[in-house]
Structures are given as structure tokens and as C-alpha cells.
């Protein structure tokens, strides 16, 4: 299971390269086509997901905003993550990622909330959580989903892979899997 999760972000990049588009371009097209809006709550990615979503012209049609909730206090105050969940599970957990995605969706009144939390390294300040452990979550009117990833590489590589995986999750939610049937 962990082996397939490690390669998740590579999968999206490979599939989209086959059709000649980057993840950012494909996600932008799908968001515009659907008329849906998105907001992002980021911890370990520090704004990378928001940056990628706004890299395309016309991103104001679908990107409402984001919060970099690097500190636990911001997760609680701005996103409504229960302090008890952070205390019990640490900020790097499925439940925190889910609460972040649901919180940003609710706060910014968007169709989709996307989040990422994890340990980028080079050391872990949340033992016993290993470096590379990442949770991404997506909240929509249809419900909330999450993925646990075990990423490898340098701090920068882990952050980039986490951002790519989050965009991949958004791509799948928006119907990106239909692209697979055209290949």
C-alpha cells in the first residue's frame, strides 16, 4: 500500500504529460468548465498549492483564497480544527487534514476545500511521525476524502510532491479520471 501511495504524485504527472498538459493547466480547465470554486488550507506546503492553482490566467474564476496554517494556533483559530484533535493526534493526521479542508471550505464558502499537512523534514518535530508522512484532504458538497502519503526526498522535494498529490486529488474529484479513458 505504501509503495503505491509514494508514487501517487508521479502517476498524475505521467498521465497528464501523456495528454500534453501540466496538472495546473488540466485542473484550471476542469475548474473553469465545472464552474466550481476552491480554497486551500496548507501546512507543510506553505502556499505551494495556492501558487500552482493561481499560476494559470483566469484563476480568479475558481480560486477564492487560502490560508497557510503552519502553526497549530492558526489551524484552530482560522480553520476551526479542534484543539483536542491536534493534542490527541498531532497536527500531522488524517483528522486534522480533514478538519482543515472542511474548515477552509466553510470559511471561504467554496465548492471545494483542499488541504495538506505533514512532515517535510529534515527532522520531525512531531515524533513518532516519520519524515515524509503527509495527509491531503478534499472537502466538497459530496463529502470529504483524504489520502495518506509516505513521500521521500529532500524537504523541498517532499513539499513539491505533496502539492502535486493534492492537485492530483483535486483533478480526480473534478473528473480527471475521464482523461484516462481517452488515452
What does each of the following model-derived ranges do?
Residues 2-183:
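Short alpha-helical segments enriched in small residues
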Amino acid at each position: 500500500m505504501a509503495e503505491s501511495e509514494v508514487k501517487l504524485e508521479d502517476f498524475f504527472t505521467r498521465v497528464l504529460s501523456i495528454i500534453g498538459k501540466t496538472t495546473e493547466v488540466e485542473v484550471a480547465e476542469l475548474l473553469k468548465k465545472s464552474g466550481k470554486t476552491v480554497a486551500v488550507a496548507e501546512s507543510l506546503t506553505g502556499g505551494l498549492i495556492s501558487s500552482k492553482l493561481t499560476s494559470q490566467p483566469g484563476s480568479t474564476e475558481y480560486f477564492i483564497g487560502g490560508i497557510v496554517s503552519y502553526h497549530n494556533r492558526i489551524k484552530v483559530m482560522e480553520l476551526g480544527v479542534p484543539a483536542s484533535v491536534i493534542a490527541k493526534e498531532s497536527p500531522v493526521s488524517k483528522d486534522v487534514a480533514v478538519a482543515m479542508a472542511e474548515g477552509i471550505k466553510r470559511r471561504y464558502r467554496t465548492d471545494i476545500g483542499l488541504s495538506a499537512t505533514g512532515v517535510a523534514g529534515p527532522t520531525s518535530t512531531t515524533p513518532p511521525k516519520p519524515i515524509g508522512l503527509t495527509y491531503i484532504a478534499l472537502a466538497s458538497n459530496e463529502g470529504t476524502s483524504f489520502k495518506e502519503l509516505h513521500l521521500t526526498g529532500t524537504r523541498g522535494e517532499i513539499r513539491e510532491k505533496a502539492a502535486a498529490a493534492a492537485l492530483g486529488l483535486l483533478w480526480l474529484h473534478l473528473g480527471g479520471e475521464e482523461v484516462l479513458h481517452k488515452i
